[in-house]
Amino acid sequence: GFSSLFKAGAKYLLKSVGKAGAQQLACKAANNCA
């Protein structure tokens, strides 16, 4: 389902842009940046 797809995407982001980049993207995606 969507959850497993999201987890796979998160792992891909972590590998490709690094932890900080992935967190920033997730923050923007959630529109919840401090």
From Swiss-Prot:
Location within or outside the cell: Secreted
GO biological process: defense response to bacterium
A cellular component annotation (GO) from this entry: extracellular region
UniProt KW keywords: Amphibian defense peptide, Antibiotic, Antimicrobial, Disulfide bond, Secreted
Disulfide cysteine pairs (residue numbers): 27-33
Protein function: Antimicrobial peptide. Active against the Gram-positive bacteria S.aureus FDA209P (MIC=14.9 ug/ml) and B.subtilis ATCC 6633 (MIC>64 ug/ml), but not active against the Gram-negative bacterium E.coli or the fungus C.albicans.
Protein name listed in UniProt: Brevinin-2GHa
Species this protein is from: Sylvirana guentheri (Gunther's frog)
